[in-house]
Amino acid sequence: TVAYAYEDYFNGTIAANHGYDMYGALVKHSCVCQGYAETMFYLLREAGLSCAIASSENINHAWNIVKIRGNWYHIDATWDDPVWDMPGRSYHDYFLVSFDTMNKNTLINHTKDRTDMVVSAQWGDTYTTAVDTTYESGKFWNGIEKAIFYKDGYWYSISEGSSKTSFNINKYQYSTNINKVLYSGTAKWTTPSGGYYPGVYSSIYLRGDNLYFTTPDSLNKIDITSTNVTPTELINIRTQYNSSTGNNLYAFGEQYGKLVYFITDSPNIKKTKDSSNSSKYNKEYAEYTFEMCISHKWDAGVVTKEPTYTSTGTKKYTCTNCGETKIETIAK
C-alpha cells in the first residue's frame, strides 16, 4: 500500500525521498500525487489500456485518465487515499468517473476546479472527453470506504449494513453480478463523551483463506471457504490494552510492509507538529503491529511422498520468515 507523503510535503523533502516518482510509491510506500499518477499510469499501460496523466495548476494536482470499452474515465488514486494515512481505509469516489463528476466533487472541498486540466504522457488512443457515468452507480465498489481484496474470481469488501451501526462482509463475483454476504455484525463506535460515530469504521485484510476484520473492540478472522462462517477473536483491546470506552480500533491494514492497527478516540486520525522539533510530527493515536507474515519466502522444500508412475507425490515447503507451511503435488 501507499501513504501520502504528508510529512515530506510539510518539510520540503518530497524530492529527496522520491515522493514524485514510482520508486517512492512502490519501494518506499510513500509519495505525493505525481508518484501516484505515474505509478497508476504504468499499471494501466501494463494492462494494455489507453491512458494518460492529467494535471491542474488550479489545484496543484495530478491524476489519471483511462479508456475502457470505448469511453474515457478519470481515476484519482491520491484523492481516494485519505491523509493522514489510515491503514485499511480507501475511498472509491474518484474511480472511473466522468470529468463533470470529478470536478463537482473537487469543488466540495476546494475553491478552484480542474477546468484548466492538461493531458500529457498519453499512451494508446488520444484523449477526447470523459462524459460516461456507467461506473458511478450500481457497482460493487460504489460507496465502499475500505480496501477491497480479490481472490480466485471474487471481490471481498466490508460495507454498511441495514443501519448505521451494522456491517456486512461481502463476497462479490463480477462475472455473475452476484453478491453474497459472508458475515453480518453490529458495531457502535463510541466517543469519550458517551455518544457514537454513525457508520462503519471496520477494516478488512485478506490473507490466504483467512479474512481479518475489526470491530471497535477487537480484531477477528473468518475462513472464507467455510460454509458456516464463525469469527475467531484474535485481539480484544479492552482486555489486552485496557482501552476505555471511547477509544476504539479505527484502522487496520498494511503500512510500510507490515500489518498495523491504530487505537484512538476518533476516526479522524491525525498527527501534529512537535513543538520542539518543527520537522517532526507526533501521532495522536496508539499504533501496534499485528505479527503476521505478509510476504512468504519459501524454502527449497522437502519431499514428503515420492511420486511413482501410478500416483502423485507431495512436497512440503516452509516459509523462512514465519514458519507457515504449504503442500504441493508432484506429478507422477
Question: Model regions: which residues?
Answer:
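Secondary-structure boundary elements
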Residues: 1-25
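Hydrophobic/aromatic-rich core segments of domains that either
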Residues: 34-100
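Short, solvent-exposed coil/turn segments at beta-strand boundaries
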Residues: 69, 149-154, 175-176, 203-210, ...
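His-Asp-centered catalytic microenvironments across diverse enzyme cores
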Residues: 71-183
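Surface-exposed loop/turn elements that mediate protein-protein interactions on large endomembrane-trafficking
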Residues: 124-139, 162-194, 218-243, 266-294
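Repeated scaffold domains used in trafficking and secretory/extracellular systems
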Residues: 136-151, 189-207, 240-257
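Residue position within the beta-strands of beta-propeller blades
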Residues: 155-159, 212-213, 261-264
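Extracellular modular ligand-binding repeats in secreted and cell-surface proteins
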Residues: 293-332
